[in-house]
Amino acid sequence: MGKNKLLHPSLVLLLLVLLPTDASVSGKPQYMVLVPSLLHTEAAEKGCVLLSYLNETVTVSASLESVRGNRSLFTDLEAENDVLHCVAFAIPKSSSNEEVMFLTVQVKGPTQEFKKRTTVMVKNEDSLVFVQTDKSIYKPAQTVKFRVVSMDENFHPLNELIPLVYIQDPKGNRIAQWQSFQLEGGLKQFSFPLSSEPFQGSYKVVVQKKSGRRTEHPFTVEEFVLPKFEVQVTVPKIITILEEEMNVSVCGLYTYGKPVPGHVTVSICRKYSDASNCHGEDSQAFCEKFSGQLNSHGCFYQQVKTKVFQLKRKEYEMKLHTKAQIQEEGTVVELTGRQSSEITRTITKLSFVKADSHFRQGIPFFGQVRLVDGKGVPIPNKVIFIRGNEANYYSNATTDEHGLVQFSINTTNVMGTSLTVRVKYKDRSPCYGYQWVSEEHEEAHHTAYLVFSPSKSFVHLEPVSHELPCGQTQTVQAHYILNGGALQGLKKLSFYYLIMAKGGIVRTGTHGLLVKQEDMKGHFSISIPVKSDIAPVARLLIYAVLPTGDVIGDSAKYDVENCLANKVDLSFSPSQSLPALHAHLRVTAAPQSLCALRAVDQSVLLMKPDAELSASSVYNLLPEKDLTGFPGPLNDQGDEDCINRHNVYINGITYTPVSSTNEKDMYSFLEDMGLKAFTNSKIRKPKLCPQLQQYEMHGPEGLRVGFYESDVMGRGHARLVHAEEPPTETVRKYFPETWIWDLVVVNSSGVAEVGVTVPDTITEWKAGAFCLSEDAGLGISSTASLRAFQPFFVELTMPYSVIRGEVFTLKATVLNYLPKCIRVSVQLEASPAFLAVPVEKEQAPHCICANGRQTVSWAITPKSLGNVNFTVSAEALESQELCGTEVASVPEYGKKDTVIKPLLVEPEGLEKETTFNSLLCPSGGEVSEELSLKLPPNVVEESARASVSVLGDILGSAMQNTQNLLQMPYGCGEQNMVLFAPNIYVLDYLNETQQLTPEIKSKAIGYLNTGYQRQLNYKHYDGSYSTFGERYGRNQGNTWLTAFVLKTFAQARAYIFIDEAHITQALIWLSQRQKDNGCFRSSGSLLNNAIKGGVEDEVTLSAYITIALLEIPLTVTHPVVRNALFCLESAWKTAQEGDHGSHVYTKALLAYAFALAGNQDKRKEVLQSLHEEAVKKDNSVHWERPQKPKAPVGHFYEPQAPSAEVEMTSYALLAYLTAQPAPTSEDLTSATNIVKWITKQQNAQGGFSSTQDTVVALHALSKYGAATFTRTGKAAQVTIQSSGTFSNKFQVDNNNRLLLQQVSLPELPGEYSMKVTGEGCVYLQTSLKYNILPEKEEFPFALGVQTLPQTCDEPKAHTSFQISLSVSYTGSRSASNMAIVDVKMVSGFIPLKPTVKMLERSNHVSRTEVSNNHVLIYLDKVSNQTLSLFFTVLQDVPVRDLKPAIVKVYDYYETDEFAIAEYNAPCSKDLGNA
């Protein structure tokens, strides 16, 4: 049976009839069991059984065999004779995701037995998972909201356990993750805040399923401004080389649907082909440019001659690129739209719309062709020529109004195994030459192959060319020819049909046909209701079993609309609304559906269109949309004997067998369906025995199998294939990008009404919903729109900030989109905070007609400081006066619009801040402290303000300000850590003292997440970190910063997700920098010179890294730690033996390192040495550097201690507190004295002067707070009293010890006393702020500022000028640490960002930032060599009587070292008149 299975590929078989005489026994029992070749575990699978011509009862059984054992699918199934019976079965989950198994089917009866075994593919059923984000694009610091949804293959919700979801940034870093969560109702919602400085680019949400398979969903993070309007460019999609003109239209539409007034510039270009090697003038693009004004509809139209593009010329792209730029009238806003047109040489094209893939001799071959032009437009009334040589068919026909021609070919006389039909309209035109493109008239041809049937009986399904629409019934015609001799006395022949979809059998049916004992020909119809169960591709199989044992059949494929059973509808009521009104969102779906809603501003979709959730995108999740063919391992070679190559004589007719691989038999129809057949019926055409000796030159013996597999693979390889009264006035201030992101459950009637408040944005909101139901599955709504609109509204234009006394112009622009003219009064509400003078003398109401706008202006002189609100109202008035030729109308609703916008008014001069801190512990008695608040003589009037804060916890102030600990920028990798690390110490402290609340925890974890993201910006490919990261050209990792990040990331793991790869990579990088003596080599620059101690650099750095490793924590036996401790012990021994000792900073680090390592002896030795060098003053202890810089002269108050001294004192404090097993009472006494000094150095936010001192000091204070924490039942009373009339009392107890209690101090200057009674300790902090006018004094920096031009003579000086800076260091050191140049903008001007960014090309500029009205320039250091810096500023809003702006340069780590200078705009006195 197994011999002669290979046919040689060069053989061609034409078999007219092949019917072995011993197979024609009348009424022989026939069995057929059909099972899909691909089965899924844990899914409802189905197999179908047909028993024919049986006179006894039989049972059918099926079992699966694998290497892990056998499993029965069904046993002893009794099936009726001549009834197609389908049985459902399920396969348990396998340990292998995909496996080939043996399927055995056995039919058994008293006299009959049939058994067959074949292979099937078994795959584990996997859920369908998708992710939906609220938007496709986000700005830095926005929150990403997303949903994870899981369904089965029928789109019903699955409440599965998802092992892992994470977010990955553009560099592949995993920045957030969620583990092991259960879906509810088939979904779960998440949110994640982006940092203020994330990597920009493509991110993705990754869902990892239990199967290990992953689903990914991309989104983009960019800095962007939402477009106000859309530029719509309309050009022909296709133009032919014969066209002489093309029409172009450009329209500008605001997101609220109104036309844009403005000017348009259009360019159309045909570019030179990239593939050509020609350059120079000949390779220039052919372009046409034109411009014009947009009309009243916001559109511009132009007819363009195509001659300029030389459409017939080669070497140029066969495409025209159209670019249109619209500049909005009255603003500098310019947006661009693009479209392209394909150039085609095809003038006409013929294509088969409907044609059979195979033909049956005697049944007409049906076909339909369409004639279209080069643009795809049907051409009617044209004669086309049809030819079918094998059938001697030659015809012509005229196309109908749709360009269609239908034809049928009589196949009775076709003697070959193929039929080729060729269709032609015109012959190809003569060639123009090698430089020119010739026109083309495309012909069409189609080849159909013979269907094999030994009985000469056939059934044929008529093709359907269109997609089957949901909710309708499709009728399919079945044509048949029956050979009377093959019926053998049969009176009724049953045709059985089944439909497969999504890889499984979904429907079956039977059609009975009364037959006569003669040849029969006819047709009947099959009705198919189109529902979601047969989408997206339905395959229909029809077959009949003849008494001879022959099976006749056909299969057809139908594309089905992507139907979803859950019909979801979404609508807004009303569909247009004024801002801030209530509206209703109505959702209808299957009862009890869980519906996920989303509504976003259309501007977001214009910025980056969404990959919208749709029925099509959901169907694309299916692993098998259409099962066809068999995967390679499942190919059945058949077990029939081959026949020899000689003539066969049957019934007086001679047949010559010839091999043909394209000839169709019943087996191939089943294969098309992806069905395995277990049968004793004849379903295969006979195989011809090979004659290899005659064909050796044609190829290897096994080529037949190879061809078969590739053919199957090519065909699919199991292919995946009630409304309120609106107000008369609106006040607008809420402008979100995502408006609605909610989950709702519809009621038992299938309806949910959601009340919403329309945001203040004047735009169109686009909403969508998807719903999940246990019964009906998934449904997706079409987009619903709500237009938030006002008949008219007012917009304000003002600068970000001004200085008190400056005059600026406040502009209010009123826009009217009513169909009629209105008379509008525009009023600015008076306020004592400013003086307003109308620019126009006449303040009478303004007449604004349809689609018009009017601007009203005031000259404003601010009088008060701080945020000053400007309230402008525009009201439509009732009036009988004419507006033009008509009486002004008044809108029924929204006749008054009010906009409130704040403006920051700043005092003149330079702001100074002084903080006074006290830790008062009454211990049952009373303690008091006097406070004298004085002001310097050069203080700016009214600029002084002071407040006192009362907290019951030493870390209270820092807890309130964890993201604002320093009043300085956070633009580098080290500075970012001050936003990150303190949150860990706060959480540890509150956890240990049992004070952690969910609110504080949530807030701190949020900060940790954003800090983590931001820090990854500074990571290098090798796992190290540097101050500005690789993107700022710093190619070398920084040893010190890498150790800092490593220990902090390791400590943060207790609270947030940190990718272990970051920790491992950093640790490896650091270990590679360890020398043989255990010390570490320095890599990268240290921006703080204070920790550079000459020869001790290596010891200091090694001590710092050892501390970091022990804080991870690594054990002292870890090889890297063990060697590092050897380095430190050796260094301490050398220092003890030497004359000069060790730097105080290094000693403090050594003391803490030995404490962490548990080396108490060494800890005591170093602390004793430190104690001898300590500065003891006012019951406090601290340490100073030996070469401490002199404090600047002329300070009104004593400045904060330098960063390095706070840092080394904090390390000493940590060493006292890290005694093992616990600090002694002597340690705590020493620690308390240190804490008194450290707390005195805190700034108003709870931080210190710079980055490292803040991080280390807060770490030390948190350890001290935890070591000394006591929970007392008694309260402390705090009284703050002035020498005048002011008095205020606070109470601090266990319930409010973390509460920041604050009061302003009204008397300045003034004398105050602060008294505390009761129990516990109270932390008091007084903050005094004032402005002073800069005076000439000696600074450690030389700072010069000039403007170019310097005078107002040049015409552009009113609107633009350059700021030129010169900076050098003149202090006591050779160079400064990292320095910041802070340039404040003069009022009404903004920096030109590209010119600021250009500064980063300088070797000395590490980074630049534009923050509100300041430009920040980071310098890695400043020496005595002068640095020159330039950038440009532009006028944003005219301001008169401009005050000078301040430029300040300061050392980031020695903040007392600074210099200030002033500059003014060249036209500072008359800018308001510009």
Swiss-Prot record:
- Residue span of region Inhibitory: 704-709, 719-723, 730-735
Glycosylated residues in this chain: 55, 70, 247, 396, 410, 869, 991, 1424
Q: Where is this region: Bait region?
A: 690-728
InterPro entries xrefs: A-macroglobulin_rcpt-bd (IPR009048), A-macroglobulin_rcpt-bd_sf (IPR036595), A2M/Complement_sys (IPR050473), A2M_N_BRD (IPR011625), A2M_TED (IPR041813), Alpha-macroglob_thiol-ester_cl (IPR047565), Alpha-macroglobulin_TED (IPR011626), Ig-like_fold (IPR013783)
Q: Which UniProt keywords apply?
A: Bait region, Disulfide bond, Glycoprotein, Isopeptide bond, Protease inhibitor, Secreted, Serine protease inhibitor, Signal, Thioester bond
PANTHER family (UniProt xref): ALPHA-2-MACROGLOBULIN, MACROGLOBULIN / COMPLEMENT
Q: How does it assemble?
A: Homotetramer; disulfide-linked.
Which named protein is this? Alpha-2-macroglobulin
What is the scientific name of the source organism? Pongo abelii (Sumatran orangutan)
